[in-house]
């Protein structure tokens, strides 16, 4: 089996299996950073494996076989059996179709990311123009009755809080919520979410992208919760999340404190996992990340090693 075939098999396998296994490992939210890393490892290696496979198919159709295919050439020379024109034509058709699909997906992904960037930058600029500053509140305040607090990437970034949220939160709760939003911006969570959501929009039938985008959004909220708890009491953050829960969606591209997986987050804030569960979950996620990183390399190495052994024997 060629390296391209191994990578193609890897991409298909991970795209099918990861959406079934990773949610089980990340459901508890015990180690959200590792959960995000596992999803990113699955998504990134799947995309890279698919791209390399397509490039390899195109290269084979355009420039012919490389030296690592010496075994097949040897068999053909000995047996007198060569590739039929029909097989060569089929390879060319597959290469053209794969290349066209990859190009189309790349263009759509780029357009989606550019559109998301325009929307968030425009909203950040508009919020700074329309909103106002209040002493003691490290955010732009909008005069709106809805309870909302969110961050928007831009130049510069903006943290937005509504008058309704100010009325619903006391000062310690507000500080904890704003620390949560700053954690999102410091960790570049909005940009990461834009990429995974753009992938999901580009290929909505590929479950690793759609399931990954939803779970990464949930886990990033937990990451921001953990960061905020380093400087604020967990109960203050918990009360702030509950006060903002169910207030409605935030603008496109924004990341809000009380809009994603509030019940799951409230549960982990109120009842943290014990040490044994933390160690177990981290070990499971660490093993998953290592496996996702090692498998494509191992598949490629085995495929190349098998052919190189044959080449060595021939020489």
PLM region spans:
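Pan-zinc metallopeptidase signature
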Residues: 264-315
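Interfacial/capping segments of alpha-helical transmembrane domains
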Residues: 57-70, 304-315
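Membrane-anchoring/interfacial helices and their immediately flanking loops
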Residues: 1-44
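Select subsegments of transmembrane alpha-helices in polytopic membrane proteins
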Residues: 40-48, 285-292
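Hydrophobic alpha-helical transmembrane segments and immediately flanking/interface helices
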Residues: 71-85, 160-178, 314
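Hydrophobic core of alpha-helical transmembrane segments in multi-pass integral membrane proteins
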Residues: 7-20, 97-106, 288-299
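Polar-ligand-bearing catalytic/cofactor-coordination segments
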Residues: 18, 22-35, 90, 94, ...
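Transmembrane alpha-helices and immediately adjacent membrane-cytoplasm interface residues
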Residues: 48-62, 72-121
């Amino acid at each position: 089996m060629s390296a391209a075939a191994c990578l193609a098999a890897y991409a298909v396998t991970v795209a099918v299996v990861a959406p079934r296994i990773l949610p089980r490992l990340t459901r508890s939210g015990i180690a959200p950073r590792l959960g995000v890393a596992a999803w990113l490892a699955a998504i990134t290696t799947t995309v890279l494996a698919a791209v390399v496979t397509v490039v390899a198919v195109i290269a084979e159709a355009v420039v012919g076989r490389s030296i690592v295919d010496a075994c097949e050439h040897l068999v053909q020379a000995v047996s007198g059996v060569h590739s039929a024109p029909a097989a060569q034509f089929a390879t060319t058709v597959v290469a053209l179709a794969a290349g066209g699909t990859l190009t189309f997906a790349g263009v759509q992904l780029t357009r989606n990311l550019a559109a998301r960037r325009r929307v968030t930058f425009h909203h950040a600029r508009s919020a700074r123009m329309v909103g106002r500053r209040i002493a003691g509140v490290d955010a732009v305040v909008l005069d709106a009755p809805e309870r909302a607090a969110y961050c928007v990437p831009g130049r510069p970034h903006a943290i937005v809080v509504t008058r309704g949220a100010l009325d619903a939160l006391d000062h310690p709760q507000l500080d904890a919520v704003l620390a949560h939003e700053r954690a999102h911006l410091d960790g570049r969570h909005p940009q990461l979410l834009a990429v995974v959501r753009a992938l999901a929009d580009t290929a909505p039938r590929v479950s690793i992208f759609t399931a990954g985008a939803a779970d990464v959004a949930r886990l990033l909220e937990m990451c921001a919760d953990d960061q905020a708890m380093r400087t604020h009491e967990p109960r203050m953050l918990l009360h702030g999340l509950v006060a903002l829960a169910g207030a409605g969606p935030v603008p496109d591209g924004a990341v809000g404190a009380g809009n994603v997986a509030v019940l799951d987050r409230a549960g982990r804030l109120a009842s943290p996992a014990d040490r044994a569960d933390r160690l177990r979950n981290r070990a499971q996620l660490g093993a998953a990340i290592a496996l996702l990183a090692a498998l494509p390399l191992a598949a490629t190495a085995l495929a190349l090693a098998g052919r190189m052994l044959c080449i060595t024997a021939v020489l």
